[in-house]
UniProtKB/Swiss-Prot annotation:
Residues 247-257 have a biased composition (Low complexity). It comes from Pepper mild mottle virus (strain Japan). It is found in: Host cytoplasm, Host cytoskeleton; Host cell junction, Host plasmodesma. Its main location: host cell. InterPro entries: TMV_movement, Viral_movement. Coiled coil: none annotated. This is Movement protein.
């Protein structure tokens, strides 16, 4: 779900806490901690890319607990001269989900003529600390119509999240209220100035296409084989040792909000 927002991040835009919850010690409330993550950056170097993004950067997690991704603010800046043609679609992905329409949490489209842009997503769901430590979120970037030589960076994206860290799910739904959530599944918003180059293809379909390309050996995104198999020198399949998914996101120098 996506909405245009200002550049700053305010917890009140995502969560309504009572006066008691704001001032009581953490041990006296089920909502242990509301945190804003550090900024994580993704540098878009290709027209199509699927990159890991650390939405919980700098957030102290609770062992054997949970973390709720209450809200996310994404800001972008085109590294281009003024009045360039083209544009981009940005989509947040939960890589745990195998169905592409369920993996897409929300998307946003804008043109290169708008040099700076920002939008927010309200995923509003919890994952376990164990899953969170494996960096389960990705960003799918689809740049179209930008005429730039390969190897240069047309677009920079920054991500910062508002999250709730808690030990137990009990009473959580009674003690916090997520605001501005609409029903009907992921929402795609489009700027009014988007050029005609934007194809009317849902981001879920783009994700499906990208994942299929990756399975065929595409080098745009290298992931772990789902079947945990490999080939020996004779071309026969053999089991490989499973590798964890604690890969680092492709980010630049970050700072705390």
């Amino acid at each position: 779900m996506a909405l245009v927002v200002k550049d700053d991040v305010k917890i009140s835009e995502f969560i309504n806490l009572s006066a008691a919850e704001k001032f009581l010690p953490a041990v006296m409330t089920s909502v242990k901690t509301v945190r804003i993550s550090k900024v994580d950056k993704v540098i878009a170097m290709e027209n199509d890319s699927l990159s890991d993004v650390d939405l919980l950067k700098g957030v102290k997690l609770v062992k054997d607990g949970y973390v709720c991704l209450a809200g996310l603010v994404v800001s972008g800046e085109w590294n281009l001269p003024d009045n360039c043609r083209g544009g981009v679609s940005v989509c947040l992905v939960d890589k745990r989900m195998q169905r592409d329409d369920e993996a897409t949490l929300g998307s946003y489209r804008t043109s290169a003529a708008k040099k700076r842009f920002a939008f927010k997503l309200i995923p509003n769901y919890s994952i376990t600390t164990a899953d969170a430590e494996r960096k389960v979120w990705q960003v799918l970037v689809n740049i179209r119509g930008v005429a730039m030589e390969k190897g240069f960076c047309p677009l920079s994206l920054e991500f910062v999240s508002v999250c709730i860290v808690h030990k137990s799910n009990i009473k959580l739904g009674l003690r916090e209220k997520i605001t501005s959530v609409s029903e009907g599944g992921p929402v795609e918003l489009t700027e009014a100035v988007v050029d005609e180059f934007i194809e009317s293809v849902p981001m879920a379909d783009r994700l499906r296409k990208f994942r299929n390309q990756s399975k065929k050996g595409s080098n745009k995104y290298v992931g772990k084989r789902n079947d945990n198999k490999g080939l020996n020198k004779e071309g026969k399949l053999f089991d490989k040792v499973r590798i964890g998914q604690n890969s680092e996101s492709s980010d630049a120098e970050s700072s705390s909000f």
